[in-house]
């Protein structure tokens, strides 16, 4: 099976969402009569203000697969609480054999992250973050691990509510 790693492409549609295609794989199904070729596309969509979603689409042709992936990503969007263009706190994410470490960074640091993780942060609108991946570098697993870490983000107000304290007590 051949694999095509597509260049990350960005799109800005009229709905204000940022779209990035992370990868397109050529897949093959072997049947009695021969091989059936198809394509699988992986995309991320975000609003530049903390909302992000991932989608995977499969079809016989690339444009159809990408369109399906974009639509699925739009349906799967969720909000991540950001603080001044970076994350609230350091967090680990895991999916399959991929593990990622996501850490907030000071202003001026930029997005220090590899491939698929960078695409997620770009569409989300994160300006400063440090991310490190361990284990599998499969784009699908890396994106899922990154989103797992982002879902674990919590604000000081969330933590204060869980502990039954005020935000001032939590922040010291």
Curated annotation (Swiss-Prot):
Alphabetical UniProt keywords: Ribonucleoprotein, Ribosomal protein, RNA-binding, rRNA-binding
Residues of the S5 DRBM domain: 17-80
GO MF annotations, alphabetized: rRNA binding; structural constituent of ribosome
Annotated SUPFAM superfamilies: dsRNA-binding domain-like (SSF54768), Ribosomal protein S5 domain 2-like (SSF54211)
Keyword Ribosomal protein applies: yes
Gene3D superfamilies: 3.30.160.20, 3.30.230.10
Alphabetical list of Pfam families matching this protein: Ribosomal_S5, Ribosomal_S5_C
Swiss-Prot/TrEMBL GO biological process terms: translation
Single GO cellular component term: small ribosomal subunit
Keyword Transmembrane helix: no
InterPro entries: Ribosomal_Su5_D2-typ_SF, Ribosomal_uS5, Ribosomal_uS5_bac-type, Ribosomal_uS5_C, Ribosomal_uS5_N, Ribosomal_uS5_N_CS, Ribsml_uS5_D2-typ_fold_subgr
Positions of disulphide bridges: none
Record text on subunit structure and interactions: Part of the 30S ribosomal subunit. Contacts proteins S4 and S8.
Family: Belongs to the universal ribosomal protein uS5 family.
NCBIfam families: rpsE_bact (TIGR01021)
Functional note: With S4 and S12 plays an important role in translational accuracy. Located at the back of the 30S subunit body where it stabilizes the conformation of the head with respect to the body.
Domain remarks in the Swiss-Prot or TrEMBL record: The N-terminal domain interacts with the head of the 30S subunit; the C-terminal domain interacts with the body and contacts protein S4. The interaction surface between S4 and S5 is involved in control of translational fidelity.
Protein known as: Small ribosomal subunit protein uS5
Encoding gene per record: rpsE
């Amino acid at each position: 099976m051949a694999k095509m790693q597509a260049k990350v492409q960005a799109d800005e549609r009229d709905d204000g969402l940022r779209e990035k295609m992370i990868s397109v794989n050529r897949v093959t199904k072997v049947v009695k009569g021969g091989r059936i070729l198809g394509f699988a596309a992986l995309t991320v969509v975000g609003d530049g203000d903390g909302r992000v979603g991932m989608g995977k689409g499969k079809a016989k042709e690339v444009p159809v697969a990408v369109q399906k992936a974009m639509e699925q990503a739009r349906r799967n969007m969720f909000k991540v609480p950001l603080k001044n263009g970076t994350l609230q706190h350091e967090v680990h994410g895991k999916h399959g054999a991929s593990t990622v470490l996501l850490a907030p960074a000071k202003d001026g640091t930029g997005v220090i992250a590899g491939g698929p993780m960078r695409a997620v942060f770009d569409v989300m609108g994160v300006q400063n973050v440090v991310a490190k991946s361990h284990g599998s570098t499969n784009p699908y697993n890396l994106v899922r691990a990154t989103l797992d870490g982002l879902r674990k983000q919590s604000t000081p107000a969330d933590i204060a509510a869980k502990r039954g304290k005020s935000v001032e007590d939590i922040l010291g």
